[in-house]
Swiss-Prot record:
Organism: Maricaulis maris (strain MCS10) (Caulobacter maris)
Phylogenetic classification of the source organism: Bacteria, Pseudomonadati, Pseudomonadota, Alphaproteobacteria, Maricaulales
Role according to the record: Binds 23S rRNA and is also seen to make contacts with the A and possibly P site tRNAs.
Keywords: Ribonucleoprotein, Ribosomal protein, RNA-binding, rRNA-binding, tRNA-binding
CDD domains per record: Ribosomal_L16_L10e
Protein name: Large ribosomal subunit protein uL16
Gene3D superfamilies according to UniProt: Ribosomal protein L10e/L16 (3.90.1170.10)
């Protein structure tokens, strides 16, 4: 699964996901992409599950680009532990996705296969998505 090699700080603030994506809203590599339509925190496991679903449907033909990276540590307190006594330990890694962000791109497969693969991948994500195609495709 994806996670940073090193980070400046072990734990991060929860924060809020405000506004639309400032960058990463155009297709850069592939012909088809999966675009987020709402703000959400996507975990490393969800990214990996989506990648697997897409590559399996494409039967390892073509190419997949993951345009998001889980760089935010999410901490969690153990079960049945009372409130207080500090922040919990980092449990998993997540990526804050803003609306308009292209999360996955694929190329090298026919349009119908690409759309089916991206629909299967979208089912693994907690975000409402839209399939986008490069103009002239």
């Amino acid at each position: 699964m994806l996670q940073p090699k090193r980070t400046k700080f072990r734990k991060a603030h929860k924060g809020r996901i405000k506004g639309a994506a400032k960058g990463g809203f155009t297709l850069n590599f592939g012909s088809y992409g999966l675009k987020a339509l709402q703000p959400e925190r996507v975990t490393a496991r969800q990214i990996e599950a989506t990648r697997r679903a897409i590559t399996r449907h494409m039967k390892r033909a073509g190419r997949v680009w993951i345009r998001i990276f889980p760089d935010v540590p999410v901490s969690k307190k153990p079960t049945e532990v009372r409130m207080g006594k500090g922040k919990g330990s980092p449990e998993f890694w997540a990526c804050k996705v803003k609306p308009g962000r292209i999360m996955f791109e694929i190329d090298g497969v026919p349009e119908n296969v690409a759309r089916e693969a991206l629909e299967l991948g979208a089912a693994k994500l907690p975000v409402k998505t839209k399939i986008v195609a490069r103009l002239g495709e």
